[in-house]
Amino acid sequence: MSHDQPAYGLWLLVILNSAIFILFAFSFFKPATARDWRTFGAFSAFIVALFVEMYGFPLTIYLLSGWLQTRYPNLDILSHDAGHLWSTLLGEKGNPHLGVLHIASYFFLAYGFYLLSSAWSVLYHAQREHALATTGPYARIRHPQYVAFVLILFGFLLQWPTLLTLAMFPILLVMYGRLAVTEEAEMRAQFGDDFERYAQRTPRFIPRMGNGLTTG
């Protein structure tokens, strides 16, 4: 991208992209409880922080500009492509959108949104019947929606890493982990032995080997 066409300061794109992905996730997740809104709010904050740096103000590039110019003297740090830091650090040439990690990110994003949607469908019907969700992705792991959010966030980190989102990511992991524990305490109180048996046979976040995370 040439300097005649600004790479940053595109605040309309910040708003549009943030709104698209937040509303897209909202349509799948449909938060209903205070815990749901905390989960979704943290995800939304990550998305906004990401697109602010992607199209608004490149804080990470600004803070690393001295090191980047010394390490990569031919790098045009004012170009949009320079924001794809993994591509730069790995020494990839050409269009960064065709880089290995960028392509991998599409799979994380696509599967994350797919898992989020599939998990919500199972959970919705279980809640209507006042039953424990144990089918679909819930047959493989106990918290597929939290895993879905993590996959989506990780996918975005592969596309456009920033200092702020890299710092937020482990914090969100801890937050989602604690929310999962709180949720399980409530499920244990509500469903008793049924939940205990479910928890014994179903891992919390990572499916057992040979028991792939599917939605069937």
Enumerate the language-model features and the residues they cover.
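Histidine-centered phosphotransfer motif of kinases
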Residues: 140-147
